[in-house]
């Protein structure tokens, strides 16, 4: 019999329901989590035995949105969901990051978490719901997991923190921050902000962590009712004698190797030491496991680097804890791009470009919450050569998507509004060298490239990555971490912003016990580093260029009467198509009558504006126009007077004498002056050549142009 176990609780302004025991009973654990009609079904499956020779933890997190959740059918050719979207990939990473550190050291059994959005309230984002579901399912499963975790979104509206704001509230918020953690400590932060202070950001993290305790309490209560027995898993016993033998052979040599400041030289020396140590030990005892020896050597490496930092000694590359690596900043490095910059910090380098396009180049995103248009695109590429390796080059991986989104968040707060700068902007960061914090180098490079392109950003922005080494109560916060310090340390803490405040904060913590005080030290140290980098950047370019690149499209905006839009577009788009072909421009018309003309040549834009003004001009009775004969009939001729408007010249209005045959006076395509006699209620226009000729050239006969044309 199906016997669901349900817990319901209030979480901010929303009601959360946790339900288990009803569905997917063959999975290790399954939970349906709902928050005000947004429901996510989360399953966990764990393998009881690890694969032989497995030397890493194979955790997979899949997050998938089903369009039926929003009452829609997919718009793809096959009418079903396909590969994960960028948004789905980012939420999968959001779930993965806080749960991964909570599995015990040495646990290498395969675990898969699948979160499926099955119902959605447009006001409630499913990401927090999915994170709560993953935490609950893992806690129920019996898999060794040191959770549960809570998750919260924090907004900042009218100088007040708001817990789990709705989508409408987020539009008014100066902050969008997601925080996840255990009962005791924060594990992950992901945020974007409108240049808030360090204290405001830290306050949001603390607020979110305090508020999510109700989630943790309710998951614990659910586990008491429905949790499966904890797996009888024990880590492999430590071979103290082997550890001591490996340390005797390698520790001193590794300590010396980690004094080599050049990354490639250091890596080469470390590889030699590891290979020689393993070869020596296998020669002594061929029954030893090479993977186990590699793990022991890695632990020694970690200890060497960490103990040196905690003792106050210089870091791997000889710097003090708060020193920034050498900076090299250049702009305008690519001749035909709209904006470009090369930003180098130590052995991390980013070649960043900015490209300007029209509204037609904006990305239309068909999301579960509805369709939206994105006019600021940020793409991050991490080729294998950047770390001296070979590899597959193809579509972006999860890491590239995540780093690109973080860099975008760092820049978004200073981007101009579309009404002030009506361009779609694409920034691409090519990581050409990498040794720590390439995403923050991308933020710095993007700021420089945008200013080089003449984009009127509100302020320059820079980013910095901080690290942490902590043993007991002793800790050291490191500025501008290397790749090794990230890998061997306890925290990856990235901060981007301007001189006025923070635009993005991302934090991933690998240990428990990170206090508010440690985060405060990290934020303050990051501010000093950010201001230093901005100072160097400002020496290269301190304000956006006064004009955009000669190779960029120039957008000219004019306003027309909304009633005239149909005239500019024409039947089936015929007029606007002809206009774009005739003038060589791109023309976009909005419902309010705003017309945007984009062209790389100013004369072409002027021509297009002139033609649109002709089309939309009101026909004035009594005014003389130059028109072109488009049709000849027995009773007169139809003459186009611009703007797609056509009027009739009656046979009696062609000349000041009796006309027997229209073609004696007019030819197809002939240009003639015409005077507007009348515009009736149906918009029909009555014209006169006779009166126009009398008004401008009283002596000229109307048949003269025809005679000239016929010679």
From Swiss-Prot:
It is found in: Cytoplasm. Residues 622-690 form the S1 motif domain. It catalyses: RNA(n+1) + phosphate = RNA(n) + a ribonucleoside 5'-diphosphate. GO terms for molecular function: 3'-5'-RNA exonuclease activity; magnesium ion binding; polyribonucleotide nucleotidyltransferase activity; RNA binding. Keywords: Cytoplasm, Magnesium, Metal-binding, Nucleotidyltransferase, RNA-binding, Transferase. Its cofactor is Mg(2+). It is an enzyme of class 2 (transferase). Residues 553-612 form the KH domain. CDD domains: KH-I_PNPase, RNase_PH_PNPase_1, RNase_PH_PNPase_2, S1_PNPase. Mg(2+) binds at residues 486, 492. Residues 690-711 are annotated as: Disordered. GO terms for cellular component: cytosol. One of its GO terms (biological process) is mRNA catabolic process. Its main location: cytoplasm. SUPFAM superfamilies: Eukaryotic type KH-domain (KH-domain type I), Nucleic acid-binding proteins, Polynucleotide phosphorylase/guanosine pentaphosphate synthase (PNPase/GPSI), domain 3, Ribonuclease PH domain 2-like, Ribosomal protein S5 domain 2-like. Its EC number is 2.7.7.8. Residues 694-711 have a biased composition (Low complexity). It holds the Pfam family RNase_PH_C. Belongs to the polyribonucleotide nucleotidyltransferase family. Involved in mRNA degradation. Catalyzes the phosphorolysis of single-stranded polyribonucleotides processively in the 3'- to 5'-direction. PANTHER family: POLYRIBONUCLEOTIDE NUCLEOTIDYLTRANSFERASE, POLYRIBONUCLEOTIDE NUCLEOTIDYLTRANSFERASE 1, MITOCHONDRIAL. Component of the RNA degradosome, which is a multiprotein complex involved in RNA processing and mRNA degradation. This is Polyribonucleotide nucleotidyltransferase. The lineage of its organism: Bacteria, Pseudomonadati, Pseudomonadota, Gammaproteobacteria, Enterobacterales.
